[in-house]
Amino acid sequence: MNKKFTDEQQQQLIGHLTKKGFYRGANIKITIFLCGGDVANHQSWRHQLSQFLAKFSDVDIFYPEDLFDDLLAGQGQHSLLSLENILAEAVDVIILFPESPGSFTELGAFSNNENLRRKLICIQDAKFKSKRSFINYGPVRLLRKFNSKSVLRCSSNELKEMCDSSIDVARKLRLYKKLMASIKKVRKENKVSKDIGNILYAERFLLPCIYLLDSVNYRTLCELAFKAIKQDDVLSKIIVRSVVSRLINERKILQMTDGYQVTALGASYVRSVFDRKTLDRLRLEIMNFENRRKSTFNYDKIPYAHP
């Protein structure tokens, strides 16, 4: 998008898109950061649980390779520790299966970070319960010291039985009950803000921006994010990069030569979860500005409206 919007115009747009009531989707989804073996390997415990959790309409699953890679690629002045703390503030629960070299590293790092440790649930193969190992004497012991429900043990058969079951059948199983009790405890003791300042929810601001500002470029999105999310410039760019990557993977937006555009799927989603009347009035006012080169949006023409 080559059009130039003044700071005042950007602030007016931000005011509308962040106004209480503009977003009308569900706020109750549980966000789970799922770590473990290769999710593409159908035998990995992480893959099995991801398939089971996908049966729940109130659960969003995020993977370190999707989120952390985007964060680390642009971390610049931000240390890994600060990015881990951002993650700790963003997700409800971290579930980790120590089943691969990468997940061993994550377990060690997360268990030693106080903010992450409070949200971590480690699910360990029961056959390693009594094994004399660094994992048992280090991270696992540390987790159990702070929260006895943070380490669950089960057999591969127990996990498979739960993951292959319907939700109604799974509710009767011991592993399901233990897992839900652990998740409930973590969420009760660690409240998460789910506004656009949360990296996992920043798309609630950026997606309608892309919807309204046809072919908006990366630079403009970063400027808007910096002013709306109120993080520093580097972190704002990291958040935009992460959100844009996720939206492209979800096929809600496309990256064109001149900027980003919503797909039909993305447009349908935007109109289903945001206030349609406000969207339509904003779009009309933006078109008028582009045609007439008005100095500001006419804020009075776009009152907050209920559909």
Curated annotation (Swiss-Prot):
Lineage: Bacteria, Pseudomonadati, Pseudomonadota, Gammaproteobacteria, Enterobacterales
Database matches in NCBIfam families: STM3845_fam
InterPro entries registered for this protein in UniProt: STM3845-like
Role of this protein: Possible ribosyltransferase/DNA-binding component of antiviral defense system retron Ec86, composed of a non-coding RNA (ncRNA), a ribosyltransferase/DNA-binding protein and a reverse transcriptase (RT). Expression of the 3-gene retron confers protection against bacteriophages T5. At multiplicity of infection (MOI) of 0.02 cultures grow normally when infected with T5 without collapsing, at MOI 2 cultures enter growth stasis.
Source organism (scientific name): Escherichia coli
GO biological process, one term: defense response to virus
Protein name, entry field: Retron Ec86 putative ribosyltransferase/DNA-binding protein
Keyword match Disulfide bond: no
Keywords in alphabetical order: Antiviral defense
